Curated annotation (Swiss-Prot):
<comment type="similarity">
    <text>Belongs to the archaeal Rpo11/eukaryotic RPB11/RPC19 RNA polymerase subunit family.</text>
</comment>
<keyword id="KW-0963">Cytoplasm</keyword>
<keyword id="KW-0808">Transferase</keyword>
<dbReference type="InterPro" id="IPR009025">
    <property type="entry name" value="RBP11-like_dimer"/>
</dbReference>
<dbReference type="GO" id="GO:0003677">
    <property type="term" value="F:DNA binding"/>
</dbReference>
<comment type="function">
    <text>DNA-dependent RNA polymerase (RNAP) catalyzes the transcription of DNA into RNA using the four ribonucleoside triphosphates as substrates.</text>
</comment>
<dbReference type="GO" id="GO:0006351">
    <property type="term" value="P:DNA-templated transcription"/>
</dbReference>
<dbReference type="GO" id="GO:0005737">
    <property type="term" value="C:cytoplasm"/>
</dbReference>
<dbReference type="InterPro" id="IPR022905">
    <property type="entry name" value="Rpo11-like"/>
</dbReference>
<dbReference type="GO" id="GO:0003899">
    <property type="term" value="F:DNA-directed RNA polymerase activity"/>
</dbReference>
<comment type="subunit">
    <text>Part of the RNA polymerase complex.</text>
</comment>
<dbReference type="InterPro" id="IPR036603">
    <property type="entry name" value="RBP11-like"/>
</dbReference>
<keyword id="KW-0804">Transcription</keyword>
<keyword id="KW-0240">DNA-directed RNA polymerase</keyword>
<dbReference type="InterPro" id="IPR008193">
    <property type="entry name" value="RNA_pol_Rpb11_13-16kDa_CS"/>
</dbReference>
<dbReference type="GO" id="GO:0000428">
    <property type="term" value="C:DNA-directed RNA polymerase complex"/>
</dbReference>
<dbReference type="Pfam" id="PF13656">
    <property type="entry name" value="RNA_pol_L_2"/>
</dbReference>
Length: 95
């Protein structure tokens, strides 16, 4: 995974998330939408063949937090949810 910043302002960030597709892009978008400081978030895959694993994101916040902080928090939430799934799976496997 590689992040390439396209445009950065105080309350807006546009970036490519190279190496990912709709699966992770949808997850990240949904988790960002849970943040009350995120006013807009969307992604697009500009060309389905040449850019299939390089979604372009736009994140806009209310200015109380930066888009970078919103992304950090979303990444933590995704990690914690994945850990919960792993823990639940380990309980099932052990029983």
């Amino acid at each position: 995974m590689k992040i390439e910043v396209i445009k950065k302002e105080e309350d807006m960030l546009e970036f490519y998330l190279e190496g990912e597709d709709h699966t992770f892009a949808n997850l990240l978008t949904e988790v960002l939408r849970e943040d009350p400081h995120v006013k807009f978030v969307a992604y697009t895959i500009e060309h389905p063949i040449t850019m299939a694993r390089k979604p372009r994101f736009r994140v806009v916040t209310d200015g109380k937090v930066t888009p970078e902080k919103a992304l950090e928090e979303a990444a933590r939430k995704i990690f914690n949810r994945a850990k919960e799934v792993l823990d639940a799976w380990e309980k099932v496997v052990k029983s």
